[in-house]
């Protein structure tokens, strides 16, 4: 997953450089640039977050039987439901990142409408989907009673709370023409909360989730057996070094495929 994160961090860095080099920018338009510099990391970190949710769904799907008999006497497949959710999230990630790149290519970065357009890439439908996927994952973790469920559920709740808090906070900020109503002090306070509190705290929680997730994936005997059968890799420990890289690349092919997210 580090490859995707490094690519997105490069996107943020190059965008910020482009904004800083924008000579002749007016004082009012600087507000647009400042806000955009906070919204861009939120969008990219949201795609990281959703990608990790895909990995969790895949992991849980491999823990399921193909079909089970429920209390009403009908056969159901939790595995199919989990994999279908994974595909839905994958499509949402693709739409988000494609929309983001198209928007950056088509907009003037310091234009007053650009921050609002970027913010609206994280729309209510997307937020509802992320919330629903988390709720389903919590149910499955409890139903399967996996060893690490309590700690992992807590970490996922931290990530979900951070995401929702950022979404709500950004949606309260006046943008477009209303943005000119904010004075410099108000803008400074808003940016400080985003830049020094909400964004870094959420990023820390996401990184922690990613570490916990891949630590569990690298120890799961069932997944490792599937990997060995598929690749003929006989190495015993896939939790570090080159074996870990090979294992993660294989997981990426299984879960994401050729789509760049």
From Swiss-Prot:
Note: Present with 2560 molecules/cell in log phase SD medium.
Protein's name according to its UniProt entry: Uncharacterized protein YJR011C
Organism: Saccharomyces cerevisiae (strain ATCC 204508 / S288c)
Lineage start: Eukaryota, Fungi, Dikarya, Ascomycota, Saccharomycotina
